[in-house]
Amino acid sequence: MVTEPSKVLDYKFLIGGRNYNMDLGKAKYISENTDFVKWKELSSRAKINLNLVHELHANTYATSTARIFELSALRCCIVSSPYQGLERWFEPKKEILIANSTEEVIEIYQTLMEDSELRLKIGLAAEKRVKKDHTARNRVQQVIDIIRKCQNKL
């Protein structure tokens, strides 16, 4: 989602987070230790934010880091690598875009970079969804519901 597209597209790619000592193409590695305030600023300014999923999350149904929810709350337009259960949280093609191949991700990047209204539309839809379905209150209620369900089985 980064290496090859950054070599063929004339866009600025910035990567933050852990440095996995991999070929980043022409992407610039920022830092592993970007504080949250700076991260919010960079994410909000970016035209496209990537959700790069580790193999563990990709292959374990409905697992994720908080990052996808944080980006959505910031109204970011997100392109994600695929993983099992993602559609449980966000509607693909409406609230998030999923790239399954290098060719597909290049096409998605080109489309988004040429269409600011589409980026805004996706970001707004993701923000609306996260504020509706993915708040701390929602998670607490889910835990309560699970506990009640377990108690009823006893």
Specify the residue positions occupied by each region the protein language model found.
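A charged, aromatic-enriched C-terminal amphipathic alpha-helix characteristic of glycosyltransferases
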Residues: 113-145
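Short acidic active-site motifs
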Residues: 37-38, 104-107
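Non-transmembrane alpha-helical segments in soluble domains
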Residues: 2-6, 109-110, 127, 144
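Glycine-centered loop/turn motifs
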Residues: 92-93
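Conserved acidic donor-binding segment of nucleotide-sugar-dependent glycosyltransferases
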Residues: 96-102, 111-116
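Generic C-terminal helix-cap and adjacent flexible tail
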Residues: 148-154
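Nucleotide-sugar donor-binding catalytic core of glycosyltransferases
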Residues: 1-68, 73-79, 83-86, 150
